[in-house]
Amino acid sequence: MKALIIDDEPLARNELTYLLNEIGGFEEINEAENVKETLEALLINQYDIIFLDVNLMDENGIELGAKIQKMKEPPAIIFATAHDQYAVQAFELNATDYILKPFGQKRIEQAVNKVRATKAKDDNSANAIANDMSANFDQSLPVEIDDKIHMLKQQNIIGIGTHNGITTIHTTNHKYETTEPLNRYEKRLNPAYFIRIHRSYIINTKHIKEVQQWFNYTYMVILTNGVKMQVGRSFMKDFKASIGLL
């Protein structure tokens, strides 16, 4: 699991980081001390669990929690604070738990186990839905090049881009170039994994390595093979929804 700790007190962040490392099972534990850092972190990573203080320097934690809950796939929120008077508001936001400072490892572990149990159920449901969608699509994509037809496994396709009449298909181990238009491939790709982010680009969301803020309030997507593809302004809403930012 990936965790994000949001607190404007360094000591509180350090303590929570230490306790989570003691509990174990976390792939990544990151920290943010304000709203700006939080939004940047949520843009780059998809977190499973967030520890959120109520009192932040630039915004009330309850208000920030409400914004996070509007994401397409919001992380579990655990309020970790010294103030008990916001508990009702927190649970109205469907918070997973509400923990008071000073933190105890057993209490933190109880909250983490709640998230793990819920995540296991959600993952099973999501896998079932993805399998149903995949059943309606071929697992391979036929690509004709020089009188040969290459059968590319869709799971190995990282992204597809077109420029000056040449369509380039990036896979995990090769790059294919063809004169076939991008639209031809878009119709054959599994929408459970692929999304068009620009009139010239289609990406596999499973191969997103990093997302950077770009010019004109757009994003630059860096894929797992290092290729960069820009998100077009008219595609921003769908892209943000696909990575859980709406």
Swiss-Prot record:
Domain of life: Bacteria
Modified residues (4-aspartylphosphate): 53
GO cellular component: cytoplasm
Domain Response regulatory span(s) in chain numbering: 2-116
Record-linked Gene3D superfamilies: 3.40.50.2300, LytTr DNA-binding domain (2.40.50.1020)
Modified how: Phosphorylated and dephosphorylated by LytS.
GO MF entry, a single one: DNA binding
Keyword Ribonucleoprotein listed: no
Cellular localization per UniProt: Cytoplasm
Keywords from the UniProt entry: Cytoplasm, DNA-binding, Phosphoprotein, Transcription, Transcription regulation, Two-component regulatory system
Domain HTH LytTR-type: 141-245
Pfam families per the UniProt record, alphabetical: LytTR, Response_reg
InterPro entries per record: CheY-like_superfamily, LytR-like, LytTR_DNA-bd_dom, Sig_transdc_resp-reg_receiver
Entry keyword annotation includes Cytoplasm: yes
Known role: Member of the two-component regulatory system LytR/LytS that regulates genes involved in autolysis, programmed cell death, biofilm formation and cell wall metabolism. Also participates in sensing and responding to host defense cationic antimicrobial peptides (HDPs). Upon phosphorylation by LytS, functions as a transcription regulator by direct binding to promoter regions of target genes including lrgA and lrgB, to positively regulate their expression.
Complexes and interactors: Homodimer; when phosphorylated.
Protein name: Transcriptional regulatory protein LytR
Originating organism: Staphylococcus aureus (strain MRSA252)
